[in-house]
Regions:
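Structural/interface elements that position substrates and couple domains in central-metabolism enzymes
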Residues: 1-207
Length: 207
């Protein structure tokens, strides 16, 4: 159905907080994943167990890009600053989410070192480049943050995304995609976007 807001300001504020709330919830999951990684605990298993409680909100760690969720919170915090209030929770969530690409890149390098694989020129594949799963849109994709972080260590990752707009990705980011059939004999594979076809992959499919 259609909900009639009291006025345009209420409608715009509602849209902003819809996306801000999601941004903050994902940021919380991302922070938990960082903590659990240091503790040696599997985040997915923790969330599955916590999800058995009827009122647990099911959000998952991941990259937050696109032109809505990662942008809308700043409209609210900017206006708050103009009114003399400095946002804390909203901006904290933004900092966490904006840093996840770098975090993933760094942890990939650490994993290579632990596996005694040479870091420079390591064969690393990134699966997915769109800003969210099961879409073609690459605008404001945070996967590019992973690419840039790996490049800092002398790694030029191989990127595959059968759903992404390849022309758009090359125009916006200067990256070219590889066919999934070429993802073989890699030192590391990062599943950056949860496309349905990636969820069905097993180790044998990329080994």
């Amino acid at each position: 159905g259609v909900h009639r807001a009291a006025n345009i300001m209420v409608a715009e504020a509602a849209k902003v907080i819809e996306n801000s709330q999601r941004d903050i919830n994902i940021a919380f999951m991302n922070e938990l994943s960082i903590i659990f990684n240091k503790m040696g605990i599997d985040t997915k298993s923790v969330l599955e167990a916590a999800g058995t409680k009827w009122n647990f909100l099911k959000f998952y760690p991941g990259l937050v890009g696109g032109h809505c969720i990662g942008v809308d919170p700043y409209y609210l915090t900017y206006r708050a600053d103009m009114l003399g209030y400095h946002s804390q929770v909203i901006l904290a969530g933004r900092r966490i989410n904006d840093g996840m690409g770098k975090y993933i890149g760094e942890n990939t390098v650490k994993s290579l070192i632990k596996a005694e694989k040479p870091v420079k020129n390591a064969r690393v594949a990134i699966l997915g480049f769109t800003f969210k799963e099961n879409c073609h849109d690459t605008r404001n994709s945070k996967v590019f943050d992973i690419v840039n972080e790996l490049r800092e260590y002398g790694i030029e990752p191989t990127i595959a995304d059968p759903q992404a707009d390849a022309d758009e990705a090359e125009r916006l980011y200067g990256v070219r995609f590889t066919d999934m059939s070429e993802i073989r004999d890699m030192d590391a594979v990062i599943v950056a976007v949860a496309h349905d076809e990636f969820a069905a992959l097993g180790i044998a499919d990329i080994d």
